[in-house]
Amino acid sequence: MFSLQDLCRKNTFFLPSNFSKHTLHLLGLYWKGHGSIQRIKNDGVLIEHDLTLSINEALILAGEEGNNDIVQLLLLWEGNLHYAIIGALKTEKYSLVCEYHSQIQDWHVLLPLIQDPETFEKCHDLSLECDLSCLLQHAVKYNMLSILVKYKEDLLNVLFRQQIQGLFILACENRMFEILTWMGQNLPIPDPEPIFSIAVVTKDLEMFSLGYKIVFEYMENQGLFHLTQVVRMVMLNRHFSMVINKGLLPFVLEILKHGGNVNRALSYAVTQNKRKILDHVVRQKNVPHKTIERMLHLAVKKHAPRKTLNLLLSYINYKVKNVKKLLEHVVKYNSTLVIRILLEKKKNLLDATLTRYVKDSTYFRVREFIQEFSISPEKFIKIAVREQKNVLIKAICEDIWENPAERIRNLKQIVCTIKYESGRQFLINIIHTIYQSYSLKPEEVLKLATFYVKHNATTHFKDLCKYLWLNRGTESKKLFLECLEIADKKEFPDIKSIVSEYINYLFTAGAITKEEIMQVYALEYAMY
């Protein structure tokens, strides 16, 4: 009989329907009050050929009845002992609990399996080393709101109040929305900010929205939490930073719905190159031209990529109204990509930008801009002359033309293209400092002297004449005669006076005749 009972209890097969109660009892397959019990498949039982239960459901029922024989049978069929204990706790069949107490190492393991709050608390009480704090933590973790409600007064006690923050964070981490709502309505949450940070990390918009309901409705209604407009905006701005950094457009819209500043959202989107967010907010909020330009300035400041700059420019049809402000940012932050984009769209701001660079920036940045946009030397020098940047002109010219003679030749050509006298004189002064700093070949000096005469550069010409007389003496006869002819033709009396003085020296030295002098003048000089 033992082997037959063992065979019937351990294997899966259908019992004959005509087995008597006595036979079933002998086989160990009779459940008092229910009838026959047999195993079907791997995880189910059939009771009285009619009711089908999972093995663990049957264990709960057997535990509730305190029927250890059936519990042992179901354990033989690979049931989970935890369910039997849960059933026994529910109906307080502690004799059955004691029977298996030694097999449970940690009573917390049973808690996720329990649906009934009272049974949940009874099970937790078996962990003798735990206290109310531990119970509340597990109640939050396994969504036992009724337990929190039961111990609300304890939570409001000053001794427990410090634990509210930890329970709140735990509820956020486990997405217990019902508990979070109750806590917001009933408990003084010290810092509600974790609900927002956790929602952003987990991309949980529902939790994020609940956070605002807790802060702006529940907690304010309790009189526990009141935000001034300034503090409210600081919080919303901080949230903008978090969600835009992760590109979470729905979260951005949620913040805007609760009073977030559109300009701040745009600023973060530009700074962090979140074009999808930028585009959506601009179009949804109908952002004005002036604001778009401010965002463009910010993009320039942050060296935004081409796509971001193009997007911003497209909103204003590539028409910049406040060019001055834009150029200030371009030069200040040495961010020239926007100028190139506008140039591609036939919006030429090169001259204006170069002027701003020459006026306000350093030699290195000016040189970089000239090279990047292939600016002609003549264009740069004319702008630099207008801004009176002599040191900058000399430095850039040294980069462009290493040979001093070549430098002077090119600068002389540019002088001839400058239409205003003060500009010509300014550049001639620079040419003269180059002459003074280097040793030029005689023929270059002679050409420079003629150039000075043509432009009535009296002081520089006088300086050059001294050099020529001291170093070449009578060999300069032809030059002086040529200069005299030019000065006479252009009616430059000061130049004529200087030349006449040196011609007099030549005449005294016998290096020049009266006839040669008279050929130059259109009238007769009595002094000769």
Curated annotation (Swiss-Prot):
Induction: Expressed in the early phase of the viral replicative cycle. The lineage of its organism: Viruses, Varidnaviria, Bamfordvirae, Nucleocytoviricota, Pokkesviricetes. This is Protein MGF 505-7R. ANK repeats lie at residues 129-158, 261-290, 292-321, 322-352. It is found in: Host cytoplasm. Belongs to the asfivirus MGF 505 family. GO terms for biological process: symbiont-mediated suppression of host innate immune response; symbiont-mediated suppression of host JAK-STAT cascade via inhibition of JAK1 activity; symbiont-mediated suppression of host type I interferon-mediated signaling pathway. Keywords: ANK repeat, Early protein, Host cytoplasm, Host-virus interaction, Inhibition of host innate immune response by virus, Inhibition of host interferon signaling pathway by virus, Inhibition of host JAK1 by virus, Interferon antiviral system evasion, Repeat, Viral immunoevasion. Plays a role in virus cell tropism, and may be required for efficient virus replication in macrophages. Interferes with host NF-kappa-B promoter activity mediated by TLR8. Mechanistically, inhibits the phosphorylation and subsequent nuclear translocation of host NF-kappa-B RELA subunit downstream of TLR8. Promotes the expression of the autophagy-related protein host ULK1 to degrade host STING and inhibit the interferon response. Also inhibits JAK1- and JAK2-mediated signaling and thus negatively regulates the IFN-gamma signaling. GO terms for cellular component: host cell cytoplasm. Interacts with host STING1. Interacts with host JAK1; this interaction leads to JAK1 degradation. Interacts with host JAK2; this interaction leads to JAK2 degradation. Interacts with host RELA; this interaction inhibits NF-kappa-B promoter activity.
